[in-house]
Amino acid sequence: MAKLLSASQVLTIKRRTIQLEGAWGDCLGEIDSTGVVLVWGQSGNGKSSAVMSLAKELTKHGKVLYVSLEEGYALSFQNTLRRYSMQECKARFQVVTGEDMEAISARLSKRRSADFVVIDSFQYSQLNYKRYLEFKKKHSNKLIIFVSHADGKQPAGRAAVSVKYDADQKIWVEGYKAISNGRYIGNTGEYIIWEQGAKEYWGRKTKNNNEE
Protein backbone atom coordinates (compact mmCIF):
# COMPACT_ATOMS: atom_id res chain seq x y z
CA MET A 1 0.00 0.00 0.00
CA ALA A 2 1.33 3.45 -0.93
CA LYS A 3 2.32 5.86 1.81
CA LEU A 4 -0.02 8.78 2.48
CA LEU A 5 1.54 12.26 2.49
CA SER A 6 0.22 15.57 3.74
CA ALA A 7 0.24 18.63 1.49
CA SER A 8 3.22 19.99 3.46
CA GLN A 9 5.16 16.78 2.89
CA VAL A 10 4.41 16.81 -0.83
CA LEU A 11 5.65 20.41 -1.06
CA THR A 12 9.00 19.42 0.48
CA ILE A 13 9.70 16.93 -2.32
CA LYS A 14 12.45 18.33 -4.52
CA ARG A 15 11.80 18.00 -8.23
CA ARG A 16 14.54 18.34 -10.83
CA THR A 17 13.20 21.06 -13.10
CA ILE A 18 14.37 23.02 -16.11
CA GLN A 19 13.92 26.76 -16.49
CA LEU A 20 13.68 27.34 -20.21
CA GLU A 21 15.05 30.60 -21.55
CA GLY A 22 14.12 33.08 -24.25
CA ALA A 23 11.11 32.39 -26.44
CA TRP A 24 10.63 28.87 -25.07
CA GLY A 25 10.76 30.28 -21.56
CA ASP A 26 7.91 32.61 -22.51
CA CYS A 27 5.97 29.67 -23.90
CA LEU A 28 6.50 26.99 -21.24
CA GLY A 29 8.40 28.58 -18.35
CA GLU A 30 9.74 26.04 -15.85
CA ILE A 31 9.14 22.37 -16.65
CA ASP A 32 9.89 18.98 -15.11
CA SER A 33 13.06 17.36 -16.44
CA THR A 34 11.20 14.06 -16.92
CA GLY A 35 7.82 13.02 -18.27
CA VAL A 36 6.09 13.17 -21.64
CA VAL A 37 5.57 16.05 -24.06
CA LEU A 38 3.26 15.70 -27.08
CA VAL A 39 3.68 18.10 -30.00
CA TRP A 40 1.08 17.81 -32.76
CA GLY A 41 -0.22 19.81 -35.68
CA GLN A 42 -1.03 19.75 -39.37
CA SER A 43 1.75 19.47 -41.93
CA GLY A 44 3.12 22.80 -43.18
CA ASN A 45 2.49 24.77 -39.98
CA GLY A 46 6.04 24.69 -38.60
CA LYS A 47 5.88 21.61 -36.35
CA SER A 48 9.32 20.25 -37.33
CA SER A 49 10.91 23.66 -36.81
CA ALA A 50 9.28 24.07 -33.40
CA VAL A 51 10.48 20.66 -32.24
CA MET A 52 14.03 21.26 -33.46
CA SER A 53 14.12 24.65 -31.74
CA LEU A 54 12.92 23.08 -28.48
CA ALA A 55 15.52 20.32 -28.83
CA LYS A 56 18.25 22.93 -29.18
CA GLU A 57 17.02 24.71 -26.05
CA LEU A 58 17.14 21.41 -24.16
CA THR A 59 20.78 20.81 -25.13
CA LYS A 60 21.61 23.55 -22.61
CA HIS A 61 20.45 21.14 -19.90
CA GLY A 62 21.64 17.73 -21.11
CA LYS A 63 21.97 15.38 -24.07
CA VAL A 64 19.21 15.10 -26.68
CA LEU A 65 18.59 12.06 -28.89
CA TYR A 66 16.47 12.78 -31.97
CA VAL A 67 14.85 9.62 -33.34
CA SER A 68 14.09 10.49 -36.97
CA LEU A 69 11.73 7.64 -37.84
CA GLU A 70 9.69 9.52 -40.42
CA GLU A 71 12.14 11.68 -42.39
CA GLY A 72 15.32 9.72 -41.80
CA TYR A 73 18.25 11.81 -43.03
CA ALA A 74 16.24 13.37 -45.87
CA LEU A 75 17.10 16.79 -47.30
CA SER A 76 14.12 18.33 -45.49
CA PHE A 77 15.53 17.08 -42.18
CA GLN A 78 19.02 18.33 -43.04
CA ASN A 79 17.57 21.74 -43.89
CA THR A 80 15.91 21.92 -40.47
CA LEU A 81 19.23 21.04 -38.83
CA ARG A 82 20.91 23.85 -40.79
CA ARG A 83 18.16 26.34 -40.00
CA TYR A 84 18.80 25.95 -36.28
CA SER A 85 22.59 25.43 -36.56
CA MET A 86 22.29 22.16 -34.69
CA GLN A 87 25.94 21.36 -35.41
CA GLU A 88 26.76 23.91 -32.69
CA CYS A 89 25.37 21.46 -30.11
CA LYS A 90 28.08 18.89 -30.93
CA ALA A 91 27.75 15.69 -28.83
CA ARG A 92 24.78 17.10 -26.89
CA PHE A 93 22.56 16.50 -29.93
CA GLN A 94 22.58 13.16 -31.74
CA VAL A 95 20.32 11.68 -34.40
CA VAL A 96 19.40 8.07 -35.09
CA THR A 97 17.17 6.50 -37.73
CA GLY A 98 16.38 2.99 -38.92
CA GLU A 99 15.84 1.50 -35.45
CA ASP A 100 12.60 0.12 -34.06
CA MET A 101 11.31 1.11 -30.64
CA GLU A 102 12.81 -1.97 -28.97
CA ALA A 103 16.27 -0.88 -30.15
CA ILE A 104 15.59 2.71 -29.09
CA SER A 105 14.49 1.48 -25.66
CA ALA A 106 17.69 -0.56 -25.31
CA ARG A 107 19.74 2.48 -26.32
CA LEU A 108 18.03 4.66 -23.71
CA SER A 109 18.66 2.03 -21.02
CA LYS A 110 22.44 2.37 -21.35
CA ARG A 111 24.56 4.36 -18.94
CA ARG A 112 25.19 7.93 -20.05
CA SER A 113 22.31 7.75 -22.52
CA ALA A 114 20.44 10.89 -23.55
CA ASP A 115 18.49 12.89 -20.97
CA PHE A 116 15.88 13.93 -23.54
CA VAL A 117 14.53 11.96 -26.50
CA VAL A 118 12.44 13.15 -29.46
CA ILE A 119 10.37 10.46 -31.22
CA ASP A 120 9.42 11.73 -34.68
CA SER A 121 6.82 10.61 -35.22
CA PHE A 122 4.46 8.78 -32.87
CA GLN A 123 2.66 7.25 -35.84
CA TYR A 124 5.92 5.86 -37.29
CA SER A 125 6.87 4.40 -33.89
CA GLN A 126 3.92 2.00 -34.30
CA LEU A 127 3.29 2.14 -30.55
CA ASN A 128 -0.17 1.38 -29.28
CA TYR A 129 -1.28 2.95 -26.00
CA LYS A 130 -0.31 -0.08 -23.90
CA ARG A 131 3.22 -0.17 -25.34
CA TYR A 132 3.46 3.60 -24.95
CA LEU A 133 2.72 3.28 -21.22
CA GLU A 134 5.34 0.53 -20.90
CA PHE A 135 7.93 2.66 -22.74
CA LYS A 136 7.12 5.69 -20.59
CA LYS A 137 7.40 3.68 -17.35
CA LYS A 138 10.69 2.06 -18.38
CA HIS A 139 12.22 5.45 -19.15
CA SER A 140 10.63 7.51 -16.39
CA ASN A 141 14.01 9.20 -15.83
CA LYS A 142 13.84 10.84 -19.28
CA LEU A 143 11.89 13.66 -20.88
CA ILE A 144 10.23 12.03 -23.89
CA ILE A 145 8.91 14.25 -26.68
CA PHE A 146 6.52 12.63 -29.14
CA VAL A 147 5.77 14.40 -32.43
CA SER A 148 2.36 13.55 -33.85
CA HIS A 149 0.36 14.03 -37.01
CA ALA A 150 -3.01 15.72 -36.56
CA ASP A 151 -6.55 14.85 -37.56
CA GLY A 152 -8.31 18.18 -37.41
CA LYS A 153 -7.25 19.67 -34.09
CA GLN A 154 -6.65 16.30 -32.43
CA PRO A 155 -3.62 14.00 -32.70
CA ALA A 156 -4.10 11.41 -35.47
CA GLY A 157 -5.22 8.00 -34.26
CA ARG A 158 -6.79 6.64 -31.09
CA ALA A 159 -3.44 5.88 -29.40
CA ALA A 160 -2.11 9.39 -30.04
CA VAL A 161 -5.28 10.93 -28.62
CA SER A 162 -4.82 8.83 -25.47
CA VAL A 163 -1.20 10.02 -25.24
CA LYS A 164 -2.47 13.59 -25.42
CA TYR A 165 -4.58 13.08 -22.30
CA ASP A 166 -1.73 11.31 -20.49
CA ALA A 167 1.10 13.69 -21.45
CA ASP A 168 2.48 16.16 -18.91
CA GLN A 169 2.84 18.83 -21.55
CA LYS A 170 0.80 19.33 -24.73
CA ILE A 171 1.93 21.67 -27.51
CA TRP A 172 -0.41 22.40 -30.43
CA VAL A 173 1.21 23.86 -33.56
CA GLU A 174 -0.88 26.01 -35.89
CA GLY A 175 -0.07 28.90 -38.21
CA TYR A 176 3.62 29.02 -37.24
CA LYS A 177 2.84 29.20 -33.53
CA ALA A 178 3.52 26.54 -30.91
CA ILE A 179 0.82 26.93 -28.25
CA SER A 180 1.06 25.45 -24.75
CA ASN A 181 -2.04 23.43 -23.90
CA GLY A 182 -0.54 21.59 -20.94
CA ARG A 183 0.50 21.97 -17.34
CA TYR A 184 3.32 24.43 -17.95
CA ILE A 185 2.61 27.88 -19.35
CA GLY A 186 5.06 30.76 -19.44
CA ASN A 187 4.38 34.47 -19.74
CA THR A 188 2.79 34.21 -23.19
CA GLY A 189 2.06 30.49 -23.59
CA GLU A 190 3.21 30.75 -27.21
CA TYR A 191 6.37 30.24 -29.25
CA ILE A 192 6.51 32.06 -32.59
CA ILE A 193 8.12 29.77 -35.16
CA TRP A 194 8.10 32.21 -38.09
CA GLU A 195 7.02 35.74 -37.28
CA GLN A 196 5.93 36.88 -40.74
CA GLY A 197 4.08 33.64 -41.47
CA ALA A 198 2.34 33.72 -38.09
CA LYS A 199 1.31 37.35 -38.55
CA GLU A 200 -0.20 36.64 -41.97
CA TYR A 201 -1.94 33.41 -40.89
CA TRP A 202 -3.49 34.74 -37.70
CA GLY A 203 -4.35 38.03 -39.37
CA ARG A 204 -6.33 36.18 -42.03
CA LYS A 205 -7.97 33.95 -39.43
CA THR A 206 -9.05 36.93 -37.32
CA LYS A 207 -10.41 38.69 -40.40
CA ASN A 208 -12.36 35.61 -41.51
CA ASN A 209 -13.80 35.14 -38.00
CA ASN A 210 -14.91 38.78 -37.92
CA GLU A 211 -16.64 38.40 -41.29
CA GLU A 212 -18.62 35.34 -40.23
Predicted regions and their residues:
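Short, surface-exposed basic-aromatic patches at helix termini and helix-loop junctions that form
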Residues: 57, 82-86, 110-111, 134-141, ...
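Short, well-ordered alpha-helix to beta-strand connector turns
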Residues: 34, 61-62, 114, 141, ...
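Charged, amphipathic alpha-helical linker segments immediately N-terminal to NTP-binding catalytic cores
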Residues: 1-14
